[in-house]
Each structure stands twice: as C-alpha cells, then as structure tokens.
Amino acid sequence: MFRAFGHDDVAVLDGGLPKWRAEGRPVTTDTPAPATVDFSATLRTDLLRSADQVNANIASGGEQVVDARGAGRYNGTEPETRPGLRSGHIPGSMNVPYAKIIQDGAMVDGVSLTQAFEAGNVDLAEPITTSCGSGITACILALGLYLVGRDDVAIYDGSWTEWGGREDLPVEK
C-alpha cells in the first residue's frame, strides 16, 4: 500500500521480529528519534481497484482477480468472519490463499512463489488485481507477485467486505 501512495522506497522485514530474534540479531529497547521529513503522497490509481472497476472486469476479462482468502471462504463452504456477508467469491476470480506463500511467518522463495500462483491458474504475464477479506492479505499476494517481477499488480482494497456486503454485485460459489 505504500507504493499506492507513491512511496516506492520501502523494505519489509521478512519474517518479522520473531525471525530477527531467532537469528540472534540485535534488538534494543531504546526509543528511536527519527528525523522529521516531509512526504507528499501521490495516489497511484493504477494500483487500486474499486468495486465498479472489478464488476466491469467480469465482462471484459481484462484482469485476473486473485483472492487471498482460504479455500473454504472462497468456495462459500465456510462462514465469513464478518456477520451479514454473503458467501462465495467474485465471479471468474482465482484462489491463491495467502498462507500458501508464507512459511513460518516469512515469504517463501521465488520458485515456490511462482509455483503457488501457477497452481492457482494465475498467468503471471497478464494483468492482475488481488482481493481478500478486507484488503490486508491482498497486499501479501501483491508483495509476493512483486517479488516475482510484477510491480504493476492492483489491489481491490474493498475486497470481500465490500463485495459480499453489496446485494447488487454478483457472487459465485
């Protein structure tokens, strides 16, 4: 999401603090004193999708929509975590559960990333929009895709919370 607001110089601590500590790396309890800087956000609308854009894409098929939720929620066989949401998925979308690209809290290697997306029938050469339950784990898929060379992946940040809550949008099971 940093990139969606024009901040391209971003790093992710792969595996987080638990992996850092497990590797015996130094930590401190000192409070940092970062320098104050000005940042002017520039919204990159090419990296975001609205419900209307995703809905129009169902007919056009111009982009692959890849859902990061687990298979049960995607297929509509497990209940949604938010009350009142319909079950299922965006018509024509594919399912690559984000847990397939994370191992022990860290991103899997590049070969395994590619294999996970290909196993979900994602064509890595075609346009991609990621979705999930609320826009958070869609970012994990987008990061994984970035790591295999796709720096143009869009995120549907409304995701299933918006889609499943709107009766005017179609659902597949």
Enumerate the language-model features and the residues they cover.
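Thiolate-centered catalytic microenvironments shared by cysteine-dependent enzyme domains
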Residues: M1-S60, T77, T137-S159
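Short acidic capping loops at alpha-helix termini that bridge into adjacent secondary structure
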Residues: D9, P91-G92, L124-P127, D151-D152
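Positively charged, proline/Ser/Thr-rich regional signature most characteristic
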Residues: S50, N55-A125, G165, L169-K173
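Structural recognition of the beta-strand scaffold that forms the well-ordered cores
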Residues: Q64-D67, T129-S131, A154-I155
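A phosphate-binding catalytic loop at a beta-strand-loop-alpha-helix junction
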Residues: I128-I140
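Extended hydrophobic/aromatic segments used for targeting, binding, or gating
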Residues: D151-K173
